[in-house]
Amino acid sequence: AAIDIDGALSNPAGLSFLPTDGFRVGVSIQSAFQTRDIDASFSTYNGFDPVNKVPTVSDVPYKKYYKGKAAAPVIPSVFAAYKKGDWTISGFFAITGGGGKASFDDGLPMFESAAMAGIFQESVAKYIKTGGQSPIVTPDMYTINSAMDGKQYIYSLQLGLSYKITDWLSAFAGGRMNYFSGNYDGYLDAKLKQNFGGADLMNLALDCDQTGWGLTPVLGVDVKYGKFNFGAKYEFKTNLNIENNTKKLDYPDSAEGLVGPYKHGVNTPNDIPSMLSVAASYRFLPMLKASVEYHFFDDKKAGMAGGKQKELERGTNEYLFGIEWDVVKRLTISGGAQITDYGLSDNFQSDVSFSCDSYSLGFGAKVMLSEKMALNVGYMWTTYHDYTKKMDNYCGTGLPGQNVYSRTNKVFGLSLDYAF
């Protein structure tokens, strides 16, 4: 329920209650550092029973920890508003979603496990065809070198108009243009160890750009009455399809099921879900204000790749709490918390896209450099709850396994606001 220049994003209707007419602008830079890790454990084939003509399975599962790192040192955003009497026009440009960029220097378990199963099955076929002359290839006989980089950004440009209907009520209507830009770039090379000949067993290579765009209608209201302020905003669902521009896609026939979504020209739904935001703030003392806020993202009604939104138990709930203290005339400090609760399920989670319930804590300060200029700084960190996904058919290998998904997130922000 903030009434400030950053309300162009969070509470645009509230900008009608800015204290003075004129033009305002805010420039913000955030730095985000994340980890996205997968602790994988899955069964592998270790031989072939020639009597019963069935593969044998290792007693000890294959275990590997896949580390994903993401760093975005500069995430810019610009907010602007012009107020004249009861009318206010506002807008912003920012990166509003997409998840950023992540690098897995040891690849992903979905590709490595499928490669291991494919190598084994191919060797069994040769073993049978040659009457046992060609050896069965098991994981101890080869090495796999793999890596995967993935990035997703949604660039947004919003413009809208607020109107102060009465002394205590205002409304907003606007639209946001969203441009999606993503890329997957990775490889997998499997080779026999030198003492087994050093021959190539399997090679995968992928370089796929993804783009798309969509429009989001936005409505908002704000009620300001004495020490109390209430703001609400509704963002309609954005229909967004992303199209592949695949520059490279090399794979064996056994990997057809894995690479299908990355083929050139494939269109995939990637809707931005509708979102309802309601917030209230109250100034208990001249120098002390507290606020509460709630967000609901209707993920189950947003189209996703393979229709996986149907696997969600429900949409996402977010609960936010904050407090501000004006220490002196030119200094305000603040603190806040956020709880994010997804409606996750095993069939929704995947190695290339997984979420974890979380809570975040943040602290900030605002310094008035002059009557017209303010400097804001803030720091936030997020603690995630690990998510364990158990599978009877691990990544299509026909064997059991599990992944434990975990994340960390730290964000530093700096912004400068100016009122002309």
Model-predicted regions and their roles:
Residues 1-98, 354, 380:
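N-terminal, post-signal peptide beta-strand-biased segments of exported outer-membrane/organellar beta-barrel
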